[in-house]
């Protein structure tokens, strides 16, 4: 899997000691399971032992569980997929999840990386899921972003 255009290469991270929480939905299980596998691999490769993993049914439940994880974790990864349908439901769910994740991150001063795919169709989600024939691994990217931000915050807070 070669990186997509414009995607920065993730440097090797030493995140040992970082407490990582991962919340992943179960809708579109093949995709969400792959996103979770990518996030777990990045965590393990970065020295994170035993991240807390919580599964929820749908994407709309992700922010409240991320909020609870942010209470006692240094970083949180939110994973899921919302695929456009025939009704405005797609926009409502995408907006609620995105705003919820952002609010949790800011309110808790804890990085919550948004790895929730919002796509027009299932193929677009599969292309981003980190499967062997996928173009990208958004689960891995989200985990890398969360861990990198947690390390940056740790460094900034140590200066204070």
Swiss-Prot record:
InterPro entries: LS (IPR034964), LS/RS (IPR002180), LS/RS_sf (IPR036467). It comes from Mycobacterium avium (strain 104). HAMAP family: Lumazine_synth. The active site is at residue 89. Its EC number is 2.5.1.78. Belongs to the DMRL synthase family. Catalyzes the formation of 6,7-dimethyl-8-ribityllumazine by condensation of 5-amino-6-(D-ribitylamino)uracil with 3,4-dihydroxy-2-butanone 4-phosphate. This is the penultimate step in the biosynthesis of riboflavin. Homopentamer. GO terms for cellular component: cytosol; riboflavin synthase complex. The gene is ribH. This is 6,7-dimethyl-8-ribityllumazine synthase. The lineage of its organism: Bacteria, Bacillati, Actinomycetota, Actinomycetes, Mycobacteriales. The keyword Transferase applies. (2S)-2-hydroxy-3-oxobutyl phosphate binds at residues 86-87, 128.
